[in-house]
């Protein structure tokens, strides 16, 4: 079995300022590895690839390169130049090569389709519990620890300052769980402008991720 994913997100090519990724590429690959999948294929999504027609995608990639026998996609799947192909197009083209197409029905929660757009909307509004409900798991931020101003340490509450890899940083103070060197800690995380200290110019305009490990 093979999972095909695209990087960067196709929307980054057409609307780079509008699409914010829910996961980093490494987070996505880590999640894929938790399932019984033999391998993951990352297809670079660039301008040239975006020009491929639905026919060439099925014939040149699914059939010729991947030798696919079964293809599983969501029922709202779009592919090919200008998203011109849909699941009906896929079924028609795959039938020629005896490739079976399987559709995954939409998941509905609270009378709304569970989608990446809905998750992004909840995260951007700081509605973590709602986002987690739609994700089916806690939202995770990954990054490396950097040196801060040591103000928390001075006050007796040392925090880990994170340089995040994620694009969506919901503002607020959250009960969290942190993983450091393979060990998990209960923690309290603040995402946003520093709540206590201001720079000489006023509020610090940089979004910070600070975690206090309990």
Say what each PLM segment does.
Residues 1-6, 22-40, 137-167:
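Short N-terminal signal/transit or membrane-insertion segments
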Residues 1-64:
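Core alpha/beta nucleotide-donor-binding catalytic domains of modification enzymes
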Residues 44, 75, 191-193:
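Short secondary-structure boundary segments
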Residues 45, 106, 164:
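Active-site donor-binding loop signature of nucleotide-sugar glycosyltransferases
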Residues 51-158:
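Classical nucleotidyltransferase
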Residues 148-214:
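Phosphate/ribose-recognition catalytic cores of enzymes acting on nucleotide-derived substrates
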